[in-house]
Curated annotation (Swiss-Prot):
Its main location: secreted. This is Polygalacturonase. Keywords: Cell wall, Cell wall biogenesis/degradation, Disulfide bond, Glycoprotein, Glycosidase, Hydrolase, Repeat, Secreted, Signal. One of its GO terms (biological process) is carbohydrate metabolic process. GO terms for cellular component: extracellular region. It catalyses: (1,4-alpha-D-galacturonosyl)n+m + H2O = (1,4-alpha-D-galacturonosyl)n + (1,4-alpha-D-galacturonosyl)m. It comes from Gossypium barbadense (Sea Island cotton). May function in the depolymerization of the pectin in its walls during pollen tube elongation, or in that of the pistil during pollination. The gene is G9. It comes from the Eukaryota.
Length: 407
């Protein structure tokens, strides 16, 4: 009989475990069923969304805010923590911003602030409806641009997973990550017209432990741009294009910028972009440092500047052209990069005369020019370390003497 006596307690323990597991399932806060949201594309979602967030954030057990399928108009929303327990947002529907840029007085549309243990998922779409903004966003119209909203902002967010979300036609950046730690963005889809200005796919700064994985980015500016203070970051399995490539920077434009270090970009495909793997710093008086940057296993398809270090970065020729960049670049590698260049200059290393690039490595490079001329490589103020087979031959071409005007 003793063996049978042992079975009953075991079954009882399993039952208790099952009951306990069922209790830790997140409580659902449905913006339609519980908070009165209407998926009619006209009624503002802001209050139901914020009310659902506040109630979920105050819960002492894990919770999920649910936005069901349908089309919702959202004027803007600021979702703040800290929350008392882990919190999720399950976005199944399409959330649209007001199309008129004048509806925004600051650069925020959907903002998450000071949230920990957060997840957003569901296959939903954040549609910035940016077409009117694109027409008015010119180099001269700075005041207008300063009020354009980012589609989704993550500010001071820790331990987060953003998964299976689409950002469409943002008026400015699609996603901005600032002062975040341990945040993963995975299986995202980002799309805007190739002529849409300042629509960086994902931009980050002053963040650590950011991972961007298995995402498709088509936009009018950098697919991914990495600002100052970014550390220990992984970017992999990205398809980029159209756009301006994957960029470190721009850096050196402002005082007291923090170092960028420990960035690995690998297993990416970049197609029909103006740049591929790029580091860009401004000429002028402000310093900074960039180190341990590694581009590896990247395919370039018809990219105008596949490999580029540009320390004379000067978009629209608005910089101090006669000054050298004060940003120090060191320990940078480009390995196993292959494909085609739309222009003959497949590799450009334009480093600072006052602070030359240190320990720049080229290994196993094979980039063919799509035109009749052979691909070339240009070098200024750098002596790259070379490993393996290299095409084009390093530093084989002339060096431009004026700052570049590419964005």
């Amino acid at each position: 009989m003793a063996p049978h006596l042992n079975i009953v307690p075991s079954m009882f323990v399993l039952l208790l475990l099952f009951i306990s597991a069922s209790k830790v399932q997140p409580d659902a806060f449905d913006v339609v069923a519980k908070f009165g949201a209407k998926a009619d594309g006209k009624t503002d979602l802001s209050k139901p969304f914020l009310d659902a967030w506040k109630e979920a954030c105050a819960s002492v057990t894990p919770s999920t805010v649910v936005i069901p399928k349908g089309t919702y108009l959202l004027s803007k929303v600021n979702l703040e923590g800290p929350c008392k327990a882990p919190i999720e947002i399950n976005v199944q529907g399409t959330i649209q911003a007001p199309a008129d840029p004048s509806a925004f007085k600051d650069p925020n549309w959907v903002r998450f602030y000071s949230v920990e243990n957060f997840k957003m998922f569901g296959g939903g779409i954040f549609d910035g409806q940016g077409s009117i903004a694109y027409e008015k966003n010119t180099c001269e119209n700075r005041e207008f641009r300063s009020k354009l909203p980012v589609n989704i902002r993550f500010d001071f967010v820790t331990n987060a997973l953003i998964q299976d979300i689409t950002s469409k036609d943002s008026k400015l950046f699609h996603i901005n990550v600032f002062a975040c730690k341990n945040i993963t963005l995975e299986r995202l889809k980002i799309e805007a017209p190739d002529e849409s200005p300042n629509t960086d796919g994902i931009h980050m700064g002053k963040s650590e432990g950011v991972n961007i994985i298995a995402s498709d980015i088509k936009t009018g500016d950098d697919c991914i741009s990495i600002g100052d203070g970014t550390k220990n970051m992984v970017i992999k399995e990205i398809t980029c294009g159209p756009g301006h490539g994957i960029s470190i920077g721009s850096l050196g434009k402002f005082q007291n910028e923090e170092p960028v270090e420990g960035i690995k970009i690998s297993n990416c495909t970049i197609t029909n972009t103006s740049n591929g793997a790029r580091i860009k710093t401004w000429p002028g008086e402000h310093g900074g440092a960039v180190s341990e940057i590694h581009f590896e296993d990247i395919t370039m398809n018809n990219v105008s500047s596949p490999i580029l270090i540009d320390q004379q970065y000067c978009p629209w020729n608005k910089c101090k052209k006669n000054e050298e960049s004060k940003v120090k670049l060191s320990n940078i590698s480009f390995k196993n990069i292959r494909g085609t260049s739309a222009l003959p200059e497949a590799i450009k290393f334009i480093c600072s005369g006052s602070s030359p690039c240190q320990n720049v490595e080229l290994a196993d490079i094979d980039i063919q020019h799509n035109g009749a001329e052979p691909a070339t490589s240009q070098c200024l103020n750098v002596k790259p370390i070379t490993i393996g087979k290299l095409n084009p031959i390093p530093c084989s071409g002339p060096v431009p003497k004026t700052p570049s005007a590419t964005a």
